[in-house]
Amino acid sequence: VVTFLYTHCRNTCPAQAQTARGALDDLGHDVPAIAISVDPARDTRASARAFLSKQHALGRIHFVLGTFKQLDPLWKGFAILPQRPTVEHIARFTLVDKRGFQRIGFPGDQATPERLAHDLKLLERE
C-alpha cells in the first residue's frame, strides 16, 4: 500500500492514514504500507512519528522522508505533483504487487478499508 501524506495536514491525510490502517486491520496481518511525504520542507522524523502515533499506525505505516530532490523521482513514478508553496496533492492509494509493479490505484475518496483489504487479498493470491 502506497499513499502520499504530509504531517501537518488536517483534512485528507489523517483520513488516508485511517483508511490504510483499517485495511491492515481488515486484512488480519500487516503488509508493507508506505506514506511518502509531499511536504519535505516541514516533514521530519519527529513530526512523522507524532502523526502516525496519533493515527494509531506507528510501526504499521512507514513514512518516507527526504528532500524535494530526493522525493521528486518517487512522486514522478506515481504521477504525484505536490504543489508549492502551499501543499496540495491528490489523495490516492496505490497497491503494488510482489514484483514492485503498480497494480491498482484508488482515488482517496473511493478507497475504503474493506475495498483495499479485498484487493490486497487478491494480490497476495497471485
Listing of model-derived features with the role each one plays in the protein:
Residues R10-C13, A41-R45, Q110-E114:
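Loop/helix-junction capping segments adjacent to catalytic residues or to phosphate/diphosphate-binding pockets
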Residues R60-I61, D72, F78-T94:
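Structural micro-motif
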Residues A15-L74:
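Structural microenvironment flanking redox-active thiols in thiol-disulfide oxidoreductases
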Residues V1-V2, A33, F93:
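Hydrophobic beta-strand anchors of alpha/beta hydrolase catalytic cores
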Residues V1-A20:
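Short active-site neighborhood of thiol/selenol oxidoreductases, capturing the structured segment around
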Residues L5, C13, L24-G28, Q55-H56, ...:
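Sec/Tat-exported extracytoplasmic proteins
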Residues T86-E126:
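Thiol-/selenol-based redox modules, centered on thioredoxin-like
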Residues Y6-T7, I36-A41, A57, F68-K69, ...:
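Solvent-exposed coil/turn segments that connect beta secondary-structure elements
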